[in-house]
Regions:
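Thiamine diphosphate
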Residues: 1-164, 169, ...
Length: 313
């Protein structure tokens, strides 16, 4: 049996930018001295005249992008999630969010799967921060196919978009020939009647694996992929909650303010349902291999399976 192909979504980001650059001369890419890591170097090599390296000055990069967007350009700013959502939050809020400018924020190295770089570089709070900015779209793709489609959709969308990419290579779960991406629309990847698993980003493939383990125990889990955390596909989540009666959210992010909180907000208003949030439990990350960190923070498939099995019982 052949192995499932795996690609890091940061690679998908760089490749998608280069592809879009062929078609759209108004697309410009800005980076903060991390083009090799964020993979925007692919775009830089193809279109050096449309690439701006702002150095280690993320706040300035954000302001430059805001200015470019008022001149007919569609800028994508790029750095680690910690350095844009964290360090440059004020500028993202005031220079991009407040005037609702057409700037795309492509961040990489989100979550604990940054690995050996450690807690200072592992941004587990970015989704929570970005959710508070009015009008900010938040996309967290699950694989290469979805990530490349998300970059294209972000370019076509008029307004600020926050894109979250990772360092860890992820299994490809979508068929490129048939996959259709739409901002704000989740998808059911697996049907089930006993519990609904709502997952995002790197946790989608682990959740699918956990669902297979649950099935062996006679527990049928519905698995929903939420690539767009804001605006959330509330209708899909509410209908699923009504069908299964229990919901589990899974994210490589703090359980405070991320996907789990968004789902709970929706269900509290429209269909109160027991919810278990699986994510980073109000703690910082640490240095270590990505796969080992997922195990320690109980975000690997086996841990997800065990938690859901106990929750359903």
């Amino acid at each position: 049996m052949s192995e499932v192909k795996k690609i890091a979504t940061r690679d998908s980001y760089g490749n998608a930018l280069a592809e879009l650059g062929k078609e759209h001369e108004n697309l410009v890419v800005l980076d903060a001295d991390l083009a090799a890591a964020t993979k925007t170097g692919v775009f830089k090599k193809a279109y050096p005249e449309r690439f701006i390296d702002c150095g280690i000055a993320e706040a300035n990069m954000t302001g430059v992008a805001a200015g470019l967007s008022t001149c007919g350009k569609v800028p994508f700013i790029s750095s680690f999630a910690m350095f844009v959502a964290g360090r440059a939050f004020e500028q993202v809020r005031n220079s991009i969010g407040y005037p609702h400018l057409n700037v795309k924020i492509g961040t990489t190295h989100a979550g604990i799967t940054v690995g050996e770089d450690g807690a200072t570089h592992q941004c587990n709070e970015d989704i929570a921060l970005m959710r508070t900015i009015p009008g900010m779209v938040i996309i967290n793709p699950a694989d290469d196919v979805e990530a490349r489609a998300a970059v294209k959709a972000a370019y076509e969308y008029e307004g600020p978009v926050y894109l979250r990419f990772g360092r860890l290579a992820l299994p490809i779960i979508h068929n490129e020939s048939s996959y259709k991406f739409e901002i704000g629309k989740g998808e059911i990847l697996r049907d089930g009647k006993d519990v609904t698993i709502v997952a995002t980003g790197a946790m989608v493939s682990n959740s699918l694996e956990a669902a297979e383990k649950l099935a062996a125990d006679g527990i049928e889990a519905k698995v929903i992929n939420i690539h767009t955390i804001k605006p959330l596909d509330e209708e899909l989540v509410v209908v699923a909650a009504k069908e299964t009666g229990k919901v589990v959210t899974v994210e490589e992010h703090s359980v405070i303010g991320g996907l789990g909180s968004a789902v709970c907000d929706a269900l509290a208003m429209k269909n109160p349902t027991p919810v278990m949030k699986i994510g980073i439990n109000d703690t910082f990350g640490e240095s270590g291999p990505a796969v080992e960190l997922l195990k320690k923070y109980q975000l690997d498939a086996e841990s997800i399976y065990e938690k859901i099995k106990n929750f359903v019982k």
